[in-house]
Amino acid sequence: VFLLISSIAAAGTSEGRLRTEMDAVNPISHYGRSKRTGELAAAALADRIPVTILRPPFVFGGGDRSGFYIFRPIKRFGIHPVPGMRHRRKISLVHAKDLADSILLAAQRGTRVDPADASCDHFRQGCYFVCDDATPFYSDLGDMIGTALGKTGILKLPVPDALARTAGGLATIVSQLRGRPGVFSLDKAREGAAGSWICSSEKIKQELGFKTKASLEDRLQETVDWYLERGWF
């Protein structure tokens, strides 16, 4: 079995409801388009090898450096930068341990991609979103992390989309000069301005019996404890 770990970025944002595997894809970033290209390349091989695709959203957990940059300003300054001016964008998340469980389930019992779907805008089978059921507003995620850190009164700092894109553009230039990618970029700013990144894990729960082993709050606490114990802050 060939398991491709793709991303919700390959599918795109969703407003007003959870994105499902049957929705037409609409990637809005270079990262998302590259992930979608990988999906189609894998699907083109599905007549020769069994292929299953997983699409996690924001992955977090101990040891993760990219997610750490969300936690750090909350710990150090009590500030949570929020894309946009109205704080109404939601986010789906999955802890790395739960994602690992889903990978094993998909390898053992998952359906496989139909090679005919390589020319379609969605996969009818063999593709799963995997996430926690909670879909908090990104602004509220700051309060949840603050609670895990024992901090209250977290300041949600609205970052206008234009400012985020400017900062992302500068960060991209710096990364190119340094010769290695950074955590923040113009592409990430583009994703942050696009809307809500929320998806449904109903399919993987129904077909494979997937379930997260702890609540989102407990997983955030576990992650904070990992960072604290190892002095990352």
Predicted regions and their residues:
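Mid/C-terminal beta-alpha module of Rossmann-like enzyme folds, strongest
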Residues: R109-V183, Q221-E222
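A conserved pocket-lining segment of Rossmann-fold NAD(P)-dependent short-chain dehydrogenase/reductase
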Residues: R72-D98, S102-A106, G110, D114-R124, ...
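Conserved Rossmann-fold NAD(P)-dependent oxidoreductase catalytic core, especially the SDR/UDP-sugar
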Residues: V1-H30, A44, T52
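Active-site helix of classical SDR
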Residues: S34
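Conserved beta-loop-beta element that borders a ligand/cofactor-binding pocket
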Residues: E39-G62
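Non-catalytic, hydrophobic alpha-helical segments
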Residues: L99, I103, V130, L141, ...
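Amphipathic terminal alpha-helices
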Residues: C199-E207, K211-F233
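Conserved C-terminal active-site "lid" loop/helix of NAD(P)H-dependent oxidoreductases
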Residues: A96, C120, C127, G169-K211
